[in-house]
Amino acid sequence: MFTDVVELTVSSGKGGQGCVSFRREKFVVNGGPNGGDGGKGGDIWFKCDNNTHTLSHFQKKMHIKADNGAPGESSNMSGKSGVKKVIIVPPGTQIIDMDSEEVLFDMLIDGQEELFISGGRGGLGNTHFKSSTNQRPTYAQPGEKGETRRIKLDLKLIADVGLVGFPNVGKSTLISTVSNARPEIANYEFTTLTPKLGQVNIGDFESFIMADIPGIIGGAHEGKGLGIEFLRHIERTQILLFMVDLASYRDLKEQIETLKAEVGAFSDKLGSSKYAIALTRADAVAQDEINDLVNSFMEIVGVKATSNSNLNFDKNLPYFIQDSADETLGYDREIPYFVMPISSATNKNIDPLKHALFNLVQTNRIYSK
């Protein structure tokens, strides 16, 4: 089961009680105090781990506690400190205070560690309270209480490219074709019920991450369908690939306008993201119809077919791609970076799609450094 939001109560450990003890040695009458200090309570830490992909290992309303410090001992021996509790979370997890709603930590990088709550200090043993007027103190400090906080863990997946489309538009087929992801694929709507990440390799040494989320329908930002729960998983993505089905019963203009409207209504940031458009299922449209269909769609989004790319597009199909993915060299973010018909079933234009998306990703990485 994919879990992306959990509420937890977390408590650091209580400090150990200081010890009341006196020297007991042969020929020593009424020995002085030698009570040791209590151990420090265990801390609460968060750690980001690439090997964790969901929050499903947390039980609902779970209470996570660090160990308490051990009491001090005689002979001025301090108690053992409580073992710290390290909470493992996947990359993309935000730690949010339930009372103030403040984002405390944004866990993004594998190996990132953050101290959340320190354990209570151990109490002082009676050795510390010896004075000229009190040679045998019978008092030792109690340990400090640990701290308890209510938090929410909110997982937002981290990807370079987010796929956005109506249900059954071919998102899962595409991500399984270009990456190592293996989502469920079937010929019915809402096959994808949880977000999926896939690594798209470009040659031997380059790659980018693609995210597939459940299909969007009109009204998704208001809670209709499954998309509202998962749109937030592409909030961190810099690039959106809108997928429009050439063979759908839905009008092409209706598809792209609805998708863009839903994304923009959900998040201003998403609405202003760089984007491209893939026209899916090109293999399902007759050859004598597809050129007119693609050209008419390009007119809808305000672009015209080009032929100046070196990405080895299928020469039998019209396509559009901007001259550069770099805004300093003429990239226009008001229009799609590219519009291309594709077929995952026949691999038509799949390689150009991968490389064109990588051009956008690479430019973003350069300017985000």
Swiss-Prot record:
From the UniProt record, give one GO term of the biological process aspect.
ribosome biogenesis
- Which PROSITE patterns does UniProt cross-reference here? G_OBG (PS51710), OBG (PS51883)
- Name the residue ranges with Polar residues bias: 128-138
What are the UniProt keywords, alphabetically? Cytoplasm, GTP-binding, Hydrolase, Magnesium, Metal-binding, Nucleotide-binding
Residues binding Mg(2+):
S172, T192
Record-level GO cellular component terms:
cytoplasm
Instruction: Kindly report, in one word, the top-level EC class recorded for this enzyme.
Output: hydrolase
Q: Which molecular function GO terms apply here?
A: GTP binding; GTPase activity; magnesium ion binding
Give EC number(s), comma-separated. Answer: 3.6.5.-
From the Swiss-Prot or TrEMBL record, state where the protein is found: Cytoplasm
Q: Obg domain spans which residues?
A: 1-158
Q: Which residues form the OBG-type G domain?
A: 159-362
Q: Which cofactor(s) are needed, names only?
A: Mg(2+)
Q: What is the superkingdom listed in this entry's lineage?
A: Bacteria
Which CDD domains does the record associate with it? Answer: Obg (cd01898)
Where is region (Disordered) located? 126-146
In the record, the note on similarity to other proteins reads: Belongs to the TRAFAC class OBG-HflX-like GTPase superfamily. OBG GTPase family.
Main function: An essential GTPase which binds GTP, GDP and possibly (p)ppGpp with moderate affinity, with high nucleotide exchange rates and a fairly low GTP hydrolysis rate. Plays a role in control of the cell cycle, stress response, ribosome biogenesis and in those bacteria that undergo differentiation, in morphogenesis control.
- Which PANTHER family would you find in this protein's record? DEVELOPMENTALLY REGULATED GTP-BINDING PROTEIN-RELATED, MITOCHONDRIAL RIBOSOME-ASSOCIATED GTPASE 2
Q: How does it assemble?
A: Monomer.
Protein name per UniProt: GTPase Obg
Q: What is the lineage of its organism?
A: Bacteria, Pseudomonadati, Campylobacterota, Epsilonproteobacteria, Campylobacterales
Q: Which gene encodes it?
A: obg
